[in-house]
Amino acid sequence: MAQCDWSSDVCSSDLSGGTPGGTGETRRSFAGWLLSAVREVVIVVSLAMVLSLVVKTFLLQPFHIPSGSMEDTLIKDDRVVVGKLTPGPIALQRGDVVVFADPGNWLGDVPVKQRTPLQSLLIFLGLAPDDSDEHLIKRVIGLPGDKVACCDVQGRVTVNGVAIVEPYVKPGDTPGGGRPDFSIVVPAGKVWVMGDHRSDSADSRMHDDGTGALGSVPIDKIHGRALVVVWPLSRLSWITAPQSVFGSVPAATP
């Protein structure tokens, strides 16, 4: 708006509504607000990434199920969440379903997955399931010192001399899965694992030399206990360890 001093015949144009330097101050104010907003977003995202990494490292981690060796409890391409407090603060138990790193070339040569940088970052942070196919998932049947054998006259697995009835074995399979009989003692610091799909699981039975030494999985290779199926949503469910199966099994004797 133009303003004039009629006594001196001088007019001036005030485009800022009467506030000198208003446009420049507005721009500086907006730039300051934008910088503050960006800084807050960076802080929030950084804290979220750190928190995700801490959760993945110490508490929970998602994994992808690459095969049908645990059917029908788990099926191929399920996504599960694994609790990292087992083993550790929460002790391993017979019947636990555990994810572990390949203990001795059980998987052979695994091709390297081709991922985008974003996919790799999400897996590293624990925001996407590990699909590297370098891990296995099986059920713990024997703890350190346990004597595990298969099969008795009724075709059942025995642990420390007690036959167990396993409702989680895939319908149509036998507890032995048609594999040769065995009788082993689980070495210290290891566990004996078997898949629920007994006829289609390359587990401890397939990698042992008859002593339990080679087929048993070192506990320090275990990443954690599978807790829940989270994907697909139609299969959302808890993964339980049926303690009643092993309730009458005595502790291992020295």
Identify the meaning behind each predicted range.
Residues 8, 13-36, 58-59, 63-64, ...:
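Soluble "head" domains of membrane/secretory-pathway proteins
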Residues 2, 28, 44-45, 49-50, ...:
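Generic hydrophobic alpha-helical membrane-segment signal
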